[in-house]
Protein backbone atom coordinates (compact mmCIF):
# COMPACT_ATOMS: atom_id res chain seq x y z
CA UNK A 1 0.00 0.00 0.00
CA UNK A 2 1.30 3.47 -0.92
CA UNK A 3 1.61 5.63 2.21
CA UNK A 4 3.31 8.55 0.44
CA UNK A 5 1.58 11.81 1.55
CA UNK A 6 -0.57 13.33 -1.17
CA UNK A 7 0.44 16.83 -0.07
CA UNK A 8 3.99 18.01 -0.65
CA UNK A 9 3.50 21.30 1.21
CA UNK A 10 0.90 22.51 3.68
CA UNK A 11 1.11 25.88 5.40
CA UNK A 12 -1.39 27.54 7.71
CA UNK A 13 -1.13 31.16 8.81
CA UNK A 14 2.61 31.26 8.02
CA UNK A 15 4.24 34.50 9.23
CA UNK A 16 7.69 36.09 8.94
CA UNK A 17 8.40 39.54 10.37
CA UNK A 18 11.36 41.80 9.48
CA UNK A 19 11.87 45.01 11.44
CA UNK A 20 8.20 45.17 12.38
CA UNK A 21 6.98 44.47 8.84
CA UNK A 22 5.24 41.22 7.94
CA UNK A 23 7.05 39.98 4.84
CA UNK A 24 4.85 36.89 4.99
CA UNK A 25 1.48 37.56 6.59
CA UNK A 26 -0.67 34.52 7.31
CA UNK A 27 0.21 32.52 4.18
CA UNK A 28 -1.88 29.42 3.46
CA UNK A 29 -0.64 26.93 0.85
CA UNK A 30 -1.81 23.45 -0.11
CA UNK A 31 0.54 21.91 -2.68
CA UNK A 32 -0.27 18.44 -4.04
CA UNK A 33 2.63 16.06 -4.62
CA UNK A 34 3.83 15.20 -8.10
CA UNK A 35 3.34 18.46 -10.00
CA UNK A 36 4.82 21.89 -10.69
CA UNK A 37 3.34 24.49 -8.36
CA UNK A 38 4.03 28.09 -9.32
CA UNK A 39 4.21 31.07 -6.98
CA UNK A 40 3.78 34.47 -8.61
CA UNK A 41 3.80 37.91 -7.07
CA UNK A 42 5.19 41.43 -7.46
CA UNK A 43 8.57 42.45 -6.12
CA UNK A 44 8.69 42.08 -2.34
CA UNK A 45 5.52 39.96 -2.15
CA UNK A 46 7.21 37.35 0.05
CA UNK A 47 8.05 34.64 -2.47
CA UNK A 48 11.70 34.06 -1.61
CA UNK A 49 11.06 34.43 2.12
CA UNK A 50 8.41 31.73 1.86
CA UNK A 51 10.80 29.37 0.09
CA UNK A 52 13.49 29.96 2.71
CA UNK A 53 11.07 29.04 5.48
CA UNK A 54 9.83 25.93 3.68
CA UNK A 55 13.43 24.88 3.02
CA UNK A 56 14.26 25.26 6.75
CA UNK A 57 16.70 28.11 6.00
CA UNK A 58 14.61 30.61 7.94
CA UNK A 59 12.51 30.07 11.06
CA UNK A 60 8.86 31.20 10.84
CA UNK A 61 7.59 33.71 13.39
CA UNK A 62 4.09 32.25 13.34
CA UNK A 63 1.84 29.65 11.80
CA UNK A 64 2.79 26.16 10.67
CA UNK A 65 4.44 24.61 7.62
CA UNK A 66 4.76 20.94 6.75
CA UNK A 67 6.69 19.24 3.95
CA UNK A 68 5.42 15.74 3.19
CA UNK A 69 3.78 15.80 6.61
CA UNK A 70 6.91 16.90 8.52
CA UNK A 71 6.98 20.18 10.43
CA UNK A 72 9.73 22.51 9.19
CA UNK A 73 10.38 23.84 12.70
CA UNK A 74 10.31 20.68 14.83
CA UNK A 75 11.58 18.22 12.17
CA UNK A 76 14.04 20.24 10.05
CA UNK A 77 16.50 17.38 9.49
CA UNK A 78 13.77 15.10 8.16
CA UNK A 79 12.54 17.86 5.85
CA UNK A 80 16.06 18.51 4.54
CA UNK A 81 16.43 14.88 3.53
CA UNK A 82 13.41 15.23 1.26
CA UNK A 83 14.21 18.52 -0.48
CA UNK A 84 16.72 20.41 -2.59
CA UNK A 85 16.99 24.10 -3.44
CA UNK A 86 18.35 25.90 -6.48
CA UNK A 87 17.94 29.46 -7.67
CA UNK A 88 19.06 32.11 -10.11
CA UNK A 89 22.63 32.15 -8.78
CA UNK A 90 24.77 29.05 -9.23
CA UNK A 91 25.95 27.29 -6.07
CA UNK A 92 28.78 25.53 -7.88
CA UNK A 93 32.54 26.18 -7.95
CA UNK A 94 33.96 28.11 -10.93
CA UNK A 95 37.42 26.65 -10.33
CA UNK A 96 36.26 23.08 -11.00
CA UNK A 97 35.09 21.33 -14.13
CA UNK A 98 31.46 20.40 -14.60
CA UNK A 99 32.20 16.78 -13.73
CA UNK A 100 34.28 17.71 -10.69
CA UNK A 101 31.47 19.87 -9.33
CA UNK A 102 28.97 17.03 -9.52
CA UNK A 103 31.40 14.47 -8.10
CA UNK A 104 32.03 16.83 -5.18
CA UNK A 105 28.29 17.15 -4.57
CA UNK A 106 27.92 13.38 -4.65
CA UNK A 107 30.68 12.92 -2.10
CA UNK A 108 29.09 15.56 0.16
CA UNK A 109 25.86 13.58 -0.05
CA UNK A 110 27.63 10.43 1.13
CA UNK A 111 28.26 8.63 -2.16
CA UNK A 112 31.39 6.54 -2.66
CA UNK A 113 33.91 7.86 -5.19
CA UNK A 114 32.72 5.29 -7.73
CA UNK A 115 29.03 6.11 -7.26
CA UNK A 116 29.71 9.86 -7.28
CA UNK A 117 31.55 9.58 -10.61
CA UNK A 118 28.80 7.38 -12.05
CA UNK A 119 26.05 9.79 -10.99
CA UNK A 120 28.02 12.79 -12.29
CA UNK A 121 28.35 11.13 -15.70
CA UNK A 122 24.61 10.36 -15.78
CA UNK A 123 23.70 13.97 -15.03
CA UNK A 124 26.27 15.54 -17.36
CA UNK A 125 24.92 13.49 -20.26
CA UNK A 126 21.29 13.85 -19.24
CA UNK A 127 21.55 17.64 -19.06
CA UNK A 128 23.27 17.95 -22.44
CA UNK A 129 26.65 18.98 -21.04
CA UNK A 130 28.72 16.08 -22.36
CA UNK A 131 30.93 18.23 -24.60
CA UNK A 132 31.78 20.46 -21.63
CA UNK A 133 32.23 17.81 -18.96
CA UNK A 134 35.97 18.52 -18.56
CA UNK A 135 35.84 22.29 -19.02
CA UNK A 136 36.18 24.68 -16.09
CA UNK A 137 32.86 26.09 -14.99
CA UNK A 138 34.06 29.67 -15.57
CA UNK A 139 34.02 28.93 -19.33
CA UNK A 140 30.33 27.90 -19.28
CA UNK A 141 27.56 30.09 -20.70
CA UNK A 142 24.75 31.26 -18.44
CA UNK A 143 22.42 28.54 -19.68
CA UNK A 144 25.04 25.83 -19.16
CA UNK A 145 25.76 27.07 -15.63
CA UNK A 146 22.08 27.02 -14.78
CA UNK A 147 21.68 23.46 -16.06
CA UNK A 148 24.71 22.37 -14.03
CA UNK A 149 23.31 24.10 -10.95
CA UNK A 150 20.04 22.19 -11.28
CA UNK A 151 21.98 18.98 -11.89
CA UNK A 152 23.96 19.61 -8.68
CA UNK A 153 20.71 20.00 -6.75
CA UNK A 154 19.46 16.56 -7.84
CA UNK A 155 22.63 14.47 -7.44
CA UNK A 156 20.44 12.74 -4.89
CA UNK A 157 16.97 12.94 -6.45
CA UNK A 158 14.78 15.01 -4.10
CA UNK A 159 11.10 14.47 -3.42
CA UNK A 160 10.66 18.26 -3.55
CA UNK A 161 12.77 20.74 -5.53
CA UNK A 162 12.55 24.48 -4.87
CA UNK A 163 13.31 26.46 -8.03
CA UNK A 164 13.61 30.15 -7.16
CA UNK A 165 13.58 32.14 -10.42
CA UNK A 166 15.76 29.56 -12.21
CA UNK A 167 15.75 31.18 -15.67
CA UNK A 168 16.24 34.86 -14.82
CA UNK A 169 18.53 36.43 -17.41
CA UNK A 170 18.68 33.39 -19.71
CA UNK A 171 18.15 33.56 -23.47
CA UNK A 172 15.02 31.85 -24.90
CA UNK A 173 16.89 28.71 -26.01
CA UNK A 174 18.44 28.20 -22.57
CA UNK A 175 15.09 28.83 -20.89
CA UNK A 176 13.47 26.14 -23.04
CA UNK A 177 16.23 23.70 -22.07
CA UNK A 178 15.60 24.37 -18.38
CA UNK A 179 11.85 23.91 -18.96
CA UNK A 180 12.49 20.49 -20.51
CA UNK A 181 14.59 19.52 -17.48
CA UNK A 182 11.83 20.56 -15.08
CA UNK A 183 9.23 18.54 -17.00
CA UNK A 184 11.48 15.48 -16.94
CA UNK A 185 11.98 15.81 -13.17
CA UNK A 186 8.23 15.90 -12.56
CA UNK A 187 7.69 12.94 -14.89
CA UNK A 188 10.20 11.05 -12.72
CA UNK A 189 8.22 11.83 -9.55
CA UNK A 190 9.75 15.03 -8.14
CA UNK A 191 7.44 17.81 -6.96
CA UNK A 192 8.64 21.28 -8.04
CA UNK A 193 7.84 24.57 -6.32
CA UNK A 194 8.63 27.31 -8.84
CA UNK A 195 8.88 31.06 -8.38
CA UNK A 196 9.36 33.08 -11.53
CA UNK A 197 9.09 36.63 -12.85
CA UNK A 198 8.15 35.28 -16.31
CA UNK A 199 4.41 34.64 -16.61
CA UNK A 200 4.87 32.66 -19.83
CA UNK A 201 7.13 30.33 -17.84
CA UNK A 202 4.42 29.78 -15.24
CA UNK A 203 1.89 29.29 -18.03
CA UNK A 204 4.10 26.65 -19.66
CA UNK A 205 5.20 24.73 -16.56
CA UNK A 206 2.86 25.16 -13.62
CA UNK A 207 -0.01 22.76 -13.01
CA UNK A 208 -1.33 25.12 -10.34
CA UNK A 209 -0.41 28.69 -9.39
CA UNK A 210 -0.71 30.78 -6.25
CA UNK A 211 -0.56 34.56 -6.68
CA UNK A 212 0.71 36.25 -3.54
CA UNK A 213 0.85 39.92 -2.62
CA UNK A 214 1.87 41.52 0.68
CA UNK A 215 2.70 38.08 2.05
CA UNK A 216 -0.72 36.51 1.44
CA UNK A 217 -2.29 34.28 -1.20
CA UNK A 218 -4.77 36.41 -3.15
CA UNK A 219 -5.67 33.86 -5.83
CA UNK A 220 -4.99 30.18 -6.52
CA UNK A 221 -5.84 27.68 -9.22
CA UNK A 222 -4.85 26.29 -12.59
CA UNK A 223 -3.86 28.78 -15.27
CA UNK A 224 -7.23 28.18 -16.92
CA UNK A 225 -9.09 28.87 -13.69
CA UNK A 226 -7.13 32.06 -13.06
CA UNK A 227 -7.71 33.30 -16.60
CA UNK A 228 -11.43 32.56 -16.31
CA UNK A 229 -11.63 34.34 -12.96
CA UNK A 230 -11.87 37.75 -14.63
CA UNK A 231 -15.22 36.60 -16.00
CA UNK A 232 -14.94 38.24 -19.40
CA UNK A 233 -13.53 38.00 -22.88
CA UNK A 234 -10.73 40.25 -24.06
CA UNK A 235 -10.93 42.12 -27.35
CA UNK A 236 -7.47 42.96 -28.68
CA UNK A 237 -6.81 44.96 -31.81
CA UNK A 238 -3.95 46.60 -33.64
CA UNK A 239 -4.45 49.61 -35.84
CA UNK A 240 -2.66 50.46 -39.05
CA UNK A 241 -0.87 53.40 -37.44
CA UNK A 242 -0.35 54.94 -34.00
CA UNK A 243 -2.02 58.22 -35.01
CA UNK A 244 -5.39 56.44 -35.17
CA UNK A 245 -5.28 55.14 -31.61
CA UNK A 246 -6.87 58.10 -29.81
CA UNK A 247 -9.87 58.17 -32.16
CA UNK A 248 -10.25 54.39 -32.03
CA UNK A 249 -10.09 54.51 -28.23
CA UNK A 250 -12.87 57.13 -28.14
CA UNK A 251 -15.12 55.15 -30.48
CA UNK A 252 -14.57 51.85 -28.68
CA UNK A 253 -15.27 53.43 -25.30
CA UNK A 254 -18.54 54.90 -26.56
CA UNK A 255 -19.62 51.65 -28.24
CA UNK A 256 -18.59 49.22 -25.50
CA UNK A 257 -19.08 51.32 -22.38
CA UNK A 258 -15.96 49.85 -20.76
CA UNK A 259 -12.41 50.97 -20.02
CA UNK A 260 -10.11 50.75 -23.03
CA UNK A 261 -6.51 49.80 -22.24
CA UNK A 262 -3.51 51.12 -24.14
CA UNK A 263 -0.89 48.43 -24.62
CA UNK A 264 2.86 49.05 -24.89
CA UNK A 265 2.57 48.78 -28.68
CA UNK A 266 1.46 52.30 -29.77
CA UNK A 267 -0.96 50.79 -32.30
CA UNK A 268 -2.63 48.38 -29.84
CA UNK A 269 -5.77 48.59 -27.71
CA UNK A 270 -7.62 46.06 -25.58
CA UNK A 271 -10.83 45.85 -23.58
CA UNK A 272 -12.61 43.28 -21.41
CA UNK A 273 -16.16 42.58 -22.58
CA UNK A 274 -18.89 40.22 -21.36
CA UNK A 275 -20.56 39.50 -24.71
CA UNK A 276 -18.48 38.62 -27.80
CA UNK A 277 -21.15 40.26 -29.95
CA UNK A 278 -20.15 43.60 -28.41
CA UNK A 279 -16.72 43.14 -29.94
CA UNK A 280 -18.10 42.48 -33.39
CA UNK A 281 -20.32 45.56 -33.22
CA UNK A 282 -17.37 47.68 -32.12
CA UNK A 283 -15.25 46.44 -35.02
CA UNK A 284 -18.09 47.23 -37.42
CA UNK A 285 -18.25 50.76 -36.02
CA UNK A 286 -14.51 51.23 -36.57
CA UNK A 287 -14.92 50.00 -40.14
CA UNK A 288 -17.67 52.53 -40.83
CA UNK A 289 -15.39 55.37 -39.72
CA UNK A 290 -12.65 54.08 -42.05
CA UNK A 291 -10.19 53.49 -39.22
CA UNK A 292 -8.02 50.68 -40.54
CA UNK A 293 -7.63 47.69 -38.21
CA UNK A 294 -4.55 45.60 -38.97
CA UNK A 295 -5.51 42.64 -36.77
CA UNK A 296 -7.89 41.70 -33.98
CA UNK A 297 -8.65 38.80 -31.67
CA UNK A 298 -11.26 37.90 -29.10
CA UNK A 299 -10.37 35.42 -26.42
CA UNK A 300 -9.60 34.57 -22.82
CA UNK A 301 -7.64 36.90 -20.56
CA UNK A 302 -3.89 36.30 -20.52
CA UNK A 303 -1.99 35.47 -17.34
CA UNK A 304 -0.39 38.93 -17.59
CA UNK A 305 -3.85 40.52 -17.50
CA UNK A 306 -4.85 38.36 -14.53
CA UNK A 307 -1.67 39.40 -12.69
CA UNK A 308 -2.36 43.08 -13.37
CA UNK A 309 -5.99 42.79 -12.23
CA UNK A 310 -5.03 40.98 -9.02
CA UNK A 311 -1.96 42.94 -7.93
CA UNK A 312 -2.29 46.29 -9.67
CA UNK A 313 1.20 45.81 -11.13
CA UNK A 314 2.15 44.67 -14.64
CA UNK A 315 4.23 41.51 -14.59
CA UNK A 316 7.24 43.22 -16.15
CA UNK A 317 7.17 46.16 -13.69
CA UNK A 318 10.45 45.04 -12.16
CA UNK A 319 14.06 44.73 -13.25
CA UNK A 320 16.38 41.78 -12.90
CA UNK A 321 18.26 43.81 -10.30
CA UNK A 322 15.05 44.24 -8.31
CA UNK A 323 14.43 40.52 -8.47
CA UNK A 324 17.95 39.84 -7.19
CA UNK A 325 17.44 42.26 -4.32
CA UNK A 326 13.99 40.91 -3.42
CA UNK A 327 13.42 40.36 0.26
CA UNK A 328 17.09 40.59 1.28
CA UNK A 329 17.56 40.08 4.97
CA UNK A 330 20.14 41.69 7.18
Swiss-Prot record:
Give the record's family classification: Belongs to the ABC transporter superfamily. Drug exporter-1 (DrugE1) (TC 3.A.1.105) family.
Q: Which InterPro entries match?
A: AAA+_ATPase, ABC_transporter-like_ATP-bd, ABC_transporter-like_CS, ABC_transporter_ATP-binding, DrrA, DrrA1-3-like_C, P-loop_NTPase
Originating organism: Streptomyces coeruleorubidus
The lineage, from the top, is: Bacteria, Bacillati, Actinomycetota, Actinomycetes, Kitasatosporales
Q: Which residues form the ABC transporter domain?
A: 9-239
Entry protein name = Daunorubicin resistance ATP-binding protein DrrA1
Outline the subunit composition. The complex is probably composed of two ATP-binding proteins (DrrA1) and two transmembrane proteins (DrrB1).
Biological process GO terms, please?
A: daunorubicin transport; doxorubicin transport; response to antibiotic
Function of this protein? Part of the ABC transporter complex DrrA1B1 involved in daunorubicin efflux. Responsible for energy coupling to the transport system. Confers self-resistance to daunorubicin, an antibiotic produced by S.coeruleorubidus.
Record-listed E.C. numbers: 7.6.2.2
Q: What class of enzyme is it?
A: translocase
